[in-house]
Design a protein with these regions (language model features):
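A short alpha-helical cap/connector motif
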Residues: 1-96, 100-125, 129-165
Length: 165
């Protein structure tokens, strides 16, 4: 789906929520052998002209390097999401929610971030459990009047894709 954004060199601004903590005391962690920030580092290489932003609830894994800035966010608290966008601005080509894999947190991301996605940009919610399909069908029916929505079934989960019109 990322490949259909546009030419990868034209992508200028990407956000990933959920950097992949390896702190087993943090909900929705990758386990102690996980590598925090691996995906945003891959985005930095893939989208060679983009500024990459990341956000996570685990303050211990936040970092900054060339073209990458990371910030604290609690997806269950819409005020921290709103505060994140005050810091990082708008006009995102791609926002990926790979953080807390819970519908309430995912919906908070949609409510706070969709307005910051560029026209023809994408907001992607990853790792949706099969049992939550009905929730995302409702979300899709609400959003589909203004945006193109797709619920993609993979072997392990669903992925919800919003293309902003």
């Amino acid at each position: 789906m990322v490949l259909c954004l546009k030419k990868k060199t034209e992508v200028k601004k990407v956000l990933e929520i959920g950097l992949g903590t390896n702190n087993e005391n943090v909900i929705s962690n990758m386990g102690k052998y996980g590598k925090p920030g691996a995906s945003i580092k891959a985005f930095k290489e893939f989208f060679s002209n983009a500024n990459i932003y990341g956000a996570d609830i685990d303050k211990e894994i936040l970092f900054k390097e060339d073209r990458i800035n990371t910030f604290y966010v609690d997806q269950t608290n819409i005020y921290t999401l709103n505060g994140l966008f005050k810091k990082i601005g708008k006009n995102f080509d791609l926002i990926i929610d790979d953080g807390l894999h819970a519908s309430n947190a995912n919906i908070n991301v949609i409510l706070s971030s969709l307005k910051f996605v560029k026209k023809n940009g994408y907001l992607i919610i990853e790792d949706i459990p099969f049992k939550a399909k009905h929730i995302w069908e409702v979300v899709s029916s609400i959003l589909s009047t203004k945006h193109k929505t797709t619920l993609v079934k993979t072997k392990q989960c669903f992925v919800f894709i919003i293309k902003k019109n």
